[in-house]
């Protein structure tokens, strides 16, 4: 049975389920069996009512998914950003049906705030920060319909790991670093992805900034 959940949501604001890397990996890797080990998930572990193998769980696949849902959210924070690198685990996203699906890309600002994406984000010439800045942009333009700007969270200065990894110690420094990202993206974007602004702030003064 192929249940179209998209049609059931026409009278509501569109809910965007956050597609996890874990979920996408199962769908993507199942498409490319290992020459030696075989399928990522062996047939013996596949439920009998999955008419189309693991593809039954791919809700972005209109013809083979057990259910279909058009809209979804996917984060650059757990994606393979190198668009020139073959990555089976990303196949659910990279090779989706663009005419019948819509995807919003989360930029990975949370990873910056938590110190996972290290670099001096205040410096537009920092190699580590620039690699992520450019990588997320290329990834967005290649695979996303809409995307969030690469914002530096206002709370990064309160995150010990984040402040240490990014060199950002104040709210204003976070704003300045976000502007660096925005300027780079505006200059180098292809226009394939439309970008949404992110409003940051922890109080009324920040919100008015």
Q: What do the predicted segments below correspond to?
A:
Residues 2-6, 190-209:
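Glycine-rich phosphate/ribose-binding loops and adjacent secondary-structure elements
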Residues 1-184:
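Non-catalytic, usually N-terminal nucleic-acid engagement modules in DNA/RNA processing proteins
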């Amino acid at each position: 049975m192929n249940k179209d959940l998209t049609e059931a949501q026409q009278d509501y604001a569109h809910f965007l389920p956050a597609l996890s890397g874990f979920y996408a990996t199962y769908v993507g890797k199942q498409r490319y069996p290992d020459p030696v080990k075989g399928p990522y998930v062996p047939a013996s572990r596949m439920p009998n009512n999955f008419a189309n193998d693991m593809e039954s769980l791919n809700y972005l696949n209109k013809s083979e998914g057990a259910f279909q849902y058009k809209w979804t959210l996917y984060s650059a924070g757990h994606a393979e950003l190198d668009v020139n690198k073959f990555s089976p685990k990303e196949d659910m996203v990279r090779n989706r049906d663009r005419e019948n699906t819509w995807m919003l890309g989360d930029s990975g600002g949370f990873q910056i705030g938590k110190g996972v994406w290290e670099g001096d984000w205040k410096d537009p010439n920092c190699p580590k920060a620039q690699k992520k800045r450019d990588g997320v942009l290329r990834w967005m333009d290649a695979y996303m319909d809409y995307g969030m700007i690469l914002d530096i969270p206002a709370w990064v200065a309160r995150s010990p790991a984040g402040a240490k990894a990014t060199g950002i110690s104040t709210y204003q420094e976070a704003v300045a670093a976000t502007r660096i990202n925005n300027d780079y993206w505006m200059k180098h974007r292809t226009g394939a992805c439309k970008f949404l602004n992110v409003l940051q702030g922890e109080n009324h003064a920040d919100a008015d900034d």
